[in-house]
Regions:
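Substrate-binding N-lobe of the ribokinase-like
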Residues: 2-12, 41, 45-113, 343-344
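Conserved post-catalytic alpha-helical subdomain immediately downstream of the catalytic base
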Residues: 235-239, 269-344
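A short, aliphatic-rich alpha-helical micro-motif
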Residues: 15, 151-152, 195-199
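Positively charged, low-complexity intrinsically disordered leader regions
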Residues: 1-37, 345
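Conserved phosphate/ATP/ADP-binding segment of small-molecule kinases
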Residues: 165-282
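Conserved phosphate-binding/catalytic loop of the ribokinase/pfkB sugar-kinase fold
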Residues: 103-109, 116-151
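Short acidic, glycine-rich surface-loop motifs adjacent to enzyme active sites
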Residues: 153-166
């Protein structure tokens, strides 16, 4: 084991016990598992023979689940409907050791559910059940109060915005302002509909496609990635920007450092964002890729924990990339444990 590996191993141990608040769009990911060996006579689609079904936390809930699996104390903040899926989210939180008192119930809102039908390790179709209108002012105020009340006991806050209406401009701005006042770091997974609400964040974490939307251009070469990273730093006035790039790893841009830092993944079984990068590299051994669902949430979770533990962003990025390499080897929305993360670090 190298000196760097030993250092990362110590960092993994330091992640446990951190207190992280997660605010955003909590969803339920449902899976229908089956087999498919024939086509329907009614339409050119496969017939899936049902085997079983399962459900896990999705969206901001997947961030919370990853944090909890890594040993953090997690305080979730969001809105769910007064319906069966909303109850299922509370049950999933409880099963993972998280309280749901930070969730606000809205009788007029349906809980977001994403149902995936999977056969032979292949997703056949996804059905989304959701509403995207912004929260009412009363609900918004209730959620903000709950977050502000808890800030004194948090080491970091994650805002996970999937553009389902829970994260409003007012909520983002007021939470960021209060976090700044208290010295609590804030990591944000932003949406393009809120270009100004996240100014002053500690770190912005997005994928290459989202970064391209922000700078209104396609990121198709090394130069465009660098320009996007610098533009996002300037626009959001944040300390760092992390752009995830699927099988090509991730890139880190810092407000105090001129050169970008790239953590390269050697796996090429799947590619979300095929963008070349030749900057400072740290390799992550290639792994078999089954499903990229939620890999970005895992990156966000590990970054948040590492920053809460006062880990430098570059070291945090190496850990986050290693974690993503583990979860893409699992089918469905997945989490990572400290044991799995330690094993991945030792393989670097």
């Amino acid at each position: 084991m190298t000196t760097d590996n030993r250092k990362l191993t110590r960092t993994v141990a330091a992640l446990r016990g951190r207190r992280i608040g997660v605010a955003g769009d909590f969803m339920l990911d449902r899976y229908i598992w089956g087999t498919a060996s024939r086509l329907s006579p009614e339409a050119p689609v496969p017939v899936v023979d049902f085997m079983n079904e399962s459900q896990v936390l999705g969206g901001a809930g997947n961030v919370a689940a990853n944090l909890a699996a890594l040993g953090a104390t997690v305080l979730p903040f969001g809105v769910v409907g007064e319906d069966e899926p909303g109850g299922a989210i509370r049950e999933c939180l409880a099963a993972a050791g998280m309280a749901s008192k930070g969730l606000v119930a809205d009788a007029s809102r349906i809980t977001t559910v994403k149902t995936r039908i999977v056969a032979r390790q292949q997703q056949i179709v996804r059905v989304d059940r959701e509403r995207r209108e912004p929260l009412s002012k009363n609900l918004e105020e209730s959620l903000i109060r709950r977050i502000k009340t808890a800030l004194g006991q948090l080491d970091a806050v994650v805002i996970s915005d999937y553009d389902k209406g829970v994260v409003t401009d007012a909520l983002a701005e007021r939470v960021l302002t209060e976090c700044h006042r208290r010295g609590v770091p804030v990591l944000v997974k932003p949406k393009t509909s809120r270009l100004f609400a996240y100014r002053g964040s500690t770190a912005i974490v997005c994928n290459a496609k989202e970064a391209g939307f922000f700078v209104t251009r396609q990121l198709d070469d090394d130069e465009s990635v660098g320009q996007a990273g610098r533009a996002l730093l300037a626009h959001f006035g944040c300390s760092s920007v992390v752009i995830t790039r699927g099988a090509d790893g991730l890139s880190v841009f810092e407000d105090t450092v001129t050169d970008a830092f790239h953590v390269a993944a050697t796996s090429r079984e799947v590619s979300l964002d095929r963008i070349g990068q030749t900057r400072t590299d740290h390799a992550s051994h290639g792994r078999q890729v089954f499903d990229v669902t939620g890999a970005g949430d895992t990156v966000l979770s590990v970054l948040a924990l590492a920053i809460a533990a006062r880990t430098p962003i570059r070291e945090a990025a190496v850990l986050a990339n290693a974690a993503a390499g583990v979860v893409v080897g699992k089918l469905g929305t997945s989490t990572i444990t400290p044991v799995e993360l330690l094993a991945a670090v030792r393989d670097l």
